[in-house]
């Protein structure tokens, strides 16, 4: 949620947020569960798509939009389901009119099986939206060159995946994700592929600025409890990063220093 005081706020496009967790709103078993999960997680933003099919009772009809307003959490519209630059740009423009916000999570799908982003067209779509005044948060792979190009065209934050959407596998390419953190100075948020709170904690320990979740919470046996677990994990990972973890060692080192000879070994004769 928006933050005005915290010294460790998440800052995106000049706006401060108290939470470093962003939460998706799809696939929850009911509107009441969705509402309770959002209230438990207290996310910075919740994502929503204009291209809803209405097959899920938690997502169908005007009640869903009423729920979003009632939650009083900033909405991050997305372009889910778009396969072309023009489709994504048009959807973003419609979302700006509906929600009255310049924020957009840019999704441009290149493969329907893996839901992998169309990296060839993603940069051009982002460039057009940035020029049109949008605060673009692009969903992308962990490819360093792609992410750098997105920054070059004006994206002030980038959202690489940990694994394909909905797989819950956690970070499948830790080396690439850590390289991104070392090379890019903009905020980085992991979007997609996290399945466990420990996954979220791990990427936060690597120095990521936040995470965006949906399926891992919505499809949990207890989505509300899982929302809270992820919120706690994100904060724990952030705190650990700031605290500065010890370096891994190859050899064992005693945690209690031993000085001199134990008293029971002294010669009392």
UniProtKB/Swiss-Prot annotation:
Pathway membership, UniProt: Cofactor biosynthesis; thiamine diphosphate biosynthesis
EC number: 2.8.1.10
Keyword Transferase recorded: yes
Region (Disordered): 245-269
Matches recorded under Gene3D superfamilies: Aldolase class I
GO cellular component, one term: cytoplasm
Active site per UniProt: 105
UniProt keyword list: Cytoplasm, Schiff base, Thiamine biosynthesis, Transferase
GO BP, one annotated term: thiamine diphosphate biosynthetic process
InterPro entries: Aldolase_TIM, Thiazole_synthase_ThiG, ThiG
Catalyzed chemical reaction(s): [ThiS sulfur-carrier protein]-C-terminal-Gly-aminoethanethioate + 2-iminoacetate + 1-deoxy-D-xylulose 5-phosphate = [ThiS sulfur-carrier protein]-C-terminal Gly-Gly + 2-[(2R,5Z)-2-carboxy-4-methylthiazol-5(2H)-ylidene]ethyl phosphate + 2 H2O + H(+)
Subcellular location: Cytoplasm
Assembly and interaction partners: Homotetramer. Forms heterodimers with either ThiH or ThiS.
Described purpose of this protein according to its UniProt entry: Catalyzes the rearrangement of 1-deoxy-D-xylulose 5-phosphate (DXP) to produce the thiazole phosphate moiety of thiamine. Sulfur is provided by the thiocarboxylate moiety of the carrier protein ThiS. In vitro, sulfur can be provided by H(2)S.
Name of the protein this chain belongs to: Thiazole synthase
Organism: Paracidovorax citrulli (strain AAC00-1)
């Amino acid at each position: 949620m928006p933050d005005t005081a915290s010294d460790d706020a998440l800052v995106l496009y000049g706006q401060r947020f108290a939470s470093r967790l962003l939460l998706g709103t799809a696939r929850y078993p009911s509107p009441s569960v969705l509402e309770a999960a959002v209230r438990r997680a207290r996310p910075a933003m919740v994502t929503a798509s204009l291209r809803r099919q209405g097959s899920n009772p938690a997502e169908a009809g005007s009640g869903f939009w009423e729920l979003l307003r009632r939650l009083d959490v900033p909405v991050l519209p997305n372009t889910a389901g778009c396969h072309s630059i023009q489709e994504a740009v048009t959807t973003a423009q419609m979302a700006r009119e509906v929600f009255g916000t310049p924020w957009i999570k840019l999704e441009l799908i290149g493969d329907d099986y893996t839901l992998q982003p169309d990296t060839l067209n993603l940069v051009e779509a982002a460039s057009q939206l940035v020029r049109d005044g949008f605060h673009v948060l692009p969903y992308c792979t962990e490819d360093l060159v792609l992410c750098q190009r997105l920054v070059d065209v004006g994206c002030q934050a980038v959202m690489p995946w940990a694994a394909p959407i909905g797989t819950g596998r956690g970070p499948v390419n830790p080396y690439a994700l850590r390289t991104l953190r070392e090379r890019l100075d903009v905020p980085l948020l992991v979007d997609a592929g996290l399945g466990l709170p420990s996954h979220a904690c791990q990427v936060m320990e690597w120095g990521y600025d936040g995470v965006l979740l949906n399926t891992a919470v919505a499809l949990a046996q207890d989505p509300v409890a899982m929302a809270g677990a992820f919120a706690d994990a994100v904060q724990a990972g952030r705190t650990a990063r700031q605290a500065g973890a010890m370096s891994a060692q190859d050899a064992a080192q005693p945690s209690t220093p031993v000085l001199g000879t134990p008293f029971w070994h002294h010669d009392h004769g």
